[in-house]
Amino acid sequence: MPGTVDALVGPEWNGEVAFAPGNASFQAFVTALRVLEGEDAAAAWVDGMAANDPELTENNLASLDLVNTGEVELGLINHYYWFRQAAEVGAENMRAQLKFLPGDPGGIVNVTGAAILKGAEGDEDALAFVEYLVSEKAQEYFVEETFEYPLLPGIAAPEGLPSIESLVNPELDLSDLESLEQTQQLLADAGLI
């Protein structure tokens, strides 16, 4: 497996990569690629991927299924899809294996957040909901059922998942990923969405 997403435009990967270009996390990754490597490099990568006859899927699970059936060699997915399927069928019954790309735009650690809207600061239900999301019970659910990284210290990540501290994220301010419309246009121009 390559150590960088840049390698995926090589001829050896022609017809061997699956991904879901309409997926929000894939689009966040391409946006990160634009921010980290520049517009020209990102456009060249997207065009190279489009020219490399990829298997375009509706979602990450479909990409994972194509790897597991041997139709492609590699799928660009979020880790938790692999863990969910492994919990259902057993990791030993899966052809697909996970690879994290340290320091590469393909290995960004993205986040999800919750906040209370300005003007709703006194809404007790909104506050209770946000407090619940960061409670031990909810964080254990995210680990055990959705195979996500926990926010609270003292709650272990899902078994088999590298510690979040061990992942090498590229130098990226996630607030710079706001230009989603340009990413979608880039993907559309390449015929991927």
Sequence positions of predicted segments:
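Structural recognition of the beta-strand scaffold that forms the well-ordered cores
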Residues: E16-A20, E73-N78, Q97-F100
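A bilobed periplasmic-binding-protein/Venus flytrap-type ligand-binding module shared by bacterial periplasmic
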Residues: R34, N110-G122, Y141
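Periplasmic-binding protein-like
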Residues: G15-P21, V46-A50, L56-T57, E92-K118, Y132-A156
